[in-house]
């Protein structure tokens, strides 16, 4: 009897995630606002914007779009996995969600982080002259911000690759056992 009560209480605690999911949807609203603000800024300066600034603005929009997709993916998968199944009119709307387990979600998040990091590095590359001109010539490599950004990006890439390899090994071993 006590065991059943404890299990019911523990299972009911999954609903504590629901307000967090709702709060994360507000993050999407904020990202949408920032996206539209950046788009408006780009469009309102279209006749005076340089090609480099146009590319940087476009990369910024792509970055925001990736981030919004990442937030939405984690939000929906978390709700579906831990809180409750999503009841919807058209089941084809989010068929990918039914095939997204925790490991697949981890890989998608890892790859999204790598993509966001790559876009950030590309934006830095586009303004490389400005960054390098602000660094004294005799500055050691360990004090160069671009060096550390590349190192961090490589850590993200290695982490994503390691997660993919680990997931692949685990998946192939699970298939052999069944």
Curated annotation (Swiss-Prot):
It is found in: Cell membrane. The chain crosses the membrane at residues 15-35, 54-74, 102-122, 145-165. It comes from the Bacteria. Keywords: Cell membrane, Membrane, Transmembrane, Transmembrane helix. Pfam families: UPF0114 (PF03350). One of its GO terms (cellular component) is plasma membrane. It is a multi-pass membrane protein. Belongs to the UPF0114 family. HAMAP family: UPF0114 (MF_00143). This is UPF0114 protein HPSH_00970.
């Amino acid at each position: 009897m006590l065991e059943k009560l404890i299990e019911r209480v523990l299972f009911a605690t999954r609903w504590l995630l629901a307000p967090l999911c709702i709060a994360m949807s507000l993050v999407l609203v904020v990202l949408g606002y920032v996206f539209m603000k950046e788009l408006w800024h780009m469009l309102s300066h279209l006749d005076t914007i340089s090609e480099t600034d146009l590319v940087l603005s476009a990369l910024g929009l792509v970055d925001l779009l990736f981030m919004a997709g990442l937030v939405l993916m984690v939000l929906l998968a978390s709700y579906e996995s831990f809180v409750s199944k999503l009841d919807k009119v058209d089941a084809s709307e989010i068929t990918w969600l039914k095939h997204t387990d925790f490991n697949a979600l981890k890989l998608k998040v890892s790859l999204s982080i790598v993509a966001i990091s790559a876009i950030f590095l590309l934006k830095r590359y586009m303004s490389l002259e400005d960054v390098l001109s602000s660094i004294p010539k005799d500055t050691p490599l360990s004090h160069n911000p671009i060096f550390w950004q590349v190192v961090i990006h490589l850590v993200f890439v290695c982490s994503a690759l390691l997660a993919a390899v680990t997931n692949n090994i685990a998946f192939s071993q699970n298939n052999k056992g069944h």
